[in-house]
């Protein structure tokens, strides 16, 4: 998922970069995926590479997927770095800070996770444990309880 604004440039860059790759048909950029389509795409993935927004981490953990997170730099978004490292501390992801991100480093981490299935499975298992499956219900109950306490 590239975002609509970047879709055409990512599509063209991928076409050129993957032109001679026999697996190029497996790469499918999308400008936007609705929540159901995103969940279905994630279901087919063994590894998710994403930014580190709280919504992204919540989705990845609910899917129980191994991930590599690249947080937006702190000068742009202070919370993404903290989110990423909290998730990594739970054993659920690999973090590559944007300033350290190179194609070789990213490819090295991807290869490491695919040549070491146990590492990938451990990340996925930790992601499942991190997920708060009933968070929406608990939040709604807390809001209702607070509202009832202040009813007046």
Question: Where does each model-flagged region fall?
Answer:
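Donor-nucleotide binding loops and adjacent catalytic segments primarily
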Residues: 1-48, 81-85, 89, 96-105
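Short histidine/acidic/glycine/proline-rich micro-motifs that form metal-
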Residues: 5, 72-75, 129
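A donor-sugar binding/catalytic signature common to diverse glycosyltransferases
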Residues: 38-80
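Hydrophobic beta-strand scaffold residues
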Residues: 67, 94-95
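Receiver (REC) domain switch/output surface
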Residues: 109-113
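A short, well-ordered alpha-helix in the C-terminal region of glycosyltransferases
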Residues: 119-133
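C-terminal alpha-helical cap of glycosyltransferases
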Residues: 132-152
């Amino acid at each position: 998922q590239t975002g609509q604004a970047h879709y055409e440039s990512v599509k063209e860059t991928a076409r050129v970069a993957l032109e001679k790759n026999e697996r190029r048909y497996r790469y499918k950029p999308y400008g936007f995926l609705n929540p159901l389509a995103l969940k279905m795409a994630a279901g087919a993935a063994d590894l998710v590479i994403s930014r580190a927004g709280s919504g992204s981490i919540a989705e990845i953990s609910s899917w129980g997927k191994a991930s590599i997170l690249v947080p937006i730099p702190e000068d742009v978004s202070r919370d993404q770095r903290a989110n990423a490292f909290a998730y990594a501390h739970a054993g659920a992801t690999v973090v590559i800070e944007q300033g350290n991100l190179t194609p070789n480093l990213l490819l090295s981490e991807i290869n490491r996770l695919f040549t070491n299935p146990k590492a990938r499975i451990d990340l996925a298992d930790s992601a499942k444990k991190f997920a708060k499956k009933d968070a929406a219900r608990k939040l709604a109950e807390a809001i209702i309880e607070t509202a009832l306490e202040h009813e007046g």
